[in-house]
Amino acid sequence: MTKALFFDIDGTLVSFETHRIPSSTIEALEAAHAKGLKIFIATGRPKAIINNLSELQDRNLIDGYITMNGAYCFVGEQVIYKSAIPQGEVKAMAAFCEKKGVPCIFVEEHHISVCQPDDMVKKIFYDFLHVNVLPTVSFEEAISNEIIQMTPFITEEEEKEIRPSIPTCEIGRWYPSFADITAKGDTKQKGIDEIIRYFGIKLEETMAFGDGGNDITMLRHAAIGVAMGQAKENVKAAADYVTAPIDEDGISKAMKHFGII
């Protein structure tokens, strides 16, 4: 019996087209929560830029958060798991981005900054994702504190180039223009394990929903993994079930299919 639902945000709960949560999704989550199921967020976003869930938060529908792809998990005000990237690999990524002349976002526990912001940062983070403008700092300043997640604006080819210099890091993508980098082992799969340990829920009682490359680990790990209909084929292949696209009531349809609501 399913007791815990894990949802990615962008492309799963929140439409890339409307930048809103479909009304059918809100109604489905309300119905599930009313039946006693726990609802958790599992996102690549840091806490500070989760700015699009007010329709769920205002209804008290969220029981906990997996953020930064599993590197920072919290329930209410209690941090139940956090993990920093080894400083040597932070320095390697900073040097790589500085040399390439590409932006990189560095995320600390309570602070986010960006180095070398360009039009792509503005287009994606500020205009498209509606993130507040981040402070611009030098690479030296950005890496002076403990870093939990790095988001370099690198291509998949550049990702292959830097990979040997960051051997103990995880690399995930939920948008083609950048990668999210965390410490080794910090994935949404890890986040699920930390959340269910805290709540005393069994893995066989979990269901996860996602659409991006950074969702693959949790779709495979949860008892039931549901891929959104607009997801790429490698994401769909990792899932147990493929539902309709987000803008065609995919969440609601999947939850009805499995008898959750």
PLM region descriptions:
Residues K3-T18:
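Asp-based phosphoryl-transfer active-site loop
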Residues S23-M120:
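Active-site phosphate-binding/coordination module
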Residues Q57-N60, Y81-A84, V121-F125, K190, ...:
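Short, hinge-like loop/turn segments at secondary-structure boundaries
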Residues F96, K100-F209, G213-M218, Q230:
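Conserved acidic, metal-coordinating active-site core of Asp-based
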Residues M1-F7, E30, A34, I201:
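Non-catalytic pre-domain segments flanking phosphatase-related domains
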Residues N60-L61, N69, S165-T168, H221-A222, ...:
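Short, structured coil segments at secondary-structure junctions
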Residues T2-A4, P22, I181-I261:
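Mg2+-dependent phosphoryl-transfer enzymes with acidic/Ser/Thr/Gly-rich catalytic loops
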